[in-house]
């Protein structure tokens, strides 16, 4: 009998590598994980709310974090549907320069004002800056984040703990470098397809209409350019006001789950709709092309 295996973790150190390249001891490990969660969650909400990414055609794909001594360098991977440019030419584009400027304004200035207003909160949280206190708050926040991830109550009910961690980002020199890399239309990634599902379902499209568009896109990539060898998409949830949950799937081509050398990309996402929450799983088998940027990103 076969077992269900995550295709990314099964192929680590053979084809794929970790997305966040850093290591630390047992004291600061849980604290640094929470920093990565806050940065990743900020970028996802920043593109959807402030930039109107559904109308502009920008989709957040992935974020890569590399740490050095008291510095962080961020690599933000963005898919732009209107532009078909290479990653080294995106510095000339004004759209991607706005993301850097708005990041410095929203992320730093917004939370500094909140900390200045809550002086009593600062005295209660920042009187003791020992390692034991930091670890106690970080473990509690990490547990509550996993518990309430689907309901999206994190930013509303746990403001005291979020302000405690955002104080650590108060120095502008802490985030030394921010690189914004745009993926063109030739690049294929499972995260792009899951975000495309999220945009279409919020715009009241049916599932079969979305699956037809994706099937038409993959067939053009498989026949002409041979960038994709196969794919599989599964959806489960209450769609179109049905009382029971439905399970729908679509597959085409070949998918080799057991072989280690096959380049597989996987994504799992939960979407909160009006009636219920639905789940989406995407498997994509990539072709043999050296210039594909997705091969270097988990």
From Swiss-Prot:
Primary localization class, coarse: mitochondrion
Coiled-coil positions: none
Presence of the UniProt keyword Ribosomal protein in the record: yes
InterPro entries: KH_sf_prok-type (IPR009019), Ribosomal_S3_C_sf (IPR036419), Ribosomal_uS3_C (IPR001351)
A GO term from the CC aspect: mitochondrion
Location(s), subcellular: Mitochondrion
Keywords tagged on the record: Mitochondrion, Ribonucleoprotein, Ribosomal protein
Name recorded for this polypeptide: Small ribosomal subunit protein uS3m
């Amino acid at each position: 009998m076969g077992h269900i295996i995550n295709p990314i973790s099964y192929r680590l150190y053979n084809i794929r590598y970790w997305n966040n390249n850093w290591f630390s001891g047992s004291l600061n490990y849980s604290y640094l994980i929470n920093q990565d969660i806050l940065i990743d969650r900020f970028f996802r909400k920043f593109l959807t709310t402030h930039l109107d990414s559904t109308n502009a055609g920008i989709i957040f794909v992935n974020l890569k974090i590399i740490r050095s001594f008291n510095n962080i360098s961020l690599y933000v991977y963005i898919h732009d549907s209107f532009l078909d440019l290479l990653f080294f030419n995106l510095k000339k584009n004004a759209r991607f320069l706005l993301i850097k400027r708005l990041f410095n304004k929203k992320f730093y200035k917004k939370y500094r004002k909140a900390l200045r207003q809550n002086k009593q909160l600062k005295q209660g949280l920042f009187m003791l800056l020992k390692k034991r206190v930091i670890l106690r708050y970080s473990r509690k926040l990490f547990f509550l984040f996993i518990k309430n991830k689907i309901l999206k109550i994190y930013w509303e009910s746990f403001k005291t703990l979020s302000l405690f961690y955002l104080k650590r980002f108060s120095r502008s020199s802490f985030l030394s470098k921010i690189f914004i890399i745009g993926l063109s239309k030739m690049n294929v990634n499972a995260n792009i397809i899951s975000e495309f599902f999220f945009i279409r379902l919020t715009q009241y499209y049916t599932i079969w209409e979305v699956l037809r568009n994706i099937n038409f896109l993959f067939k053009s990539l498989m026949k002409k350019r041979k960038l994709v060898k196969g794919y599989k998409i599964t959806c489960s949830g209450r769609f179109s006001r049905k009382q029971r949950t439905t399970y729908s799937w679509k597959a085409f081509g070949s998918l080799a789950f057991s072989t280690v050398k096959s380049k597989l990309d996987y994504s799992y996402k939960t979407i909160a709709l009006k009636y219920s929450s639905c789940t989406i799983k995407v498997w994509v088998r990539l072709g043999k092309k050296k210039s594909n940027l997705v091969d270097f990103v988990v």
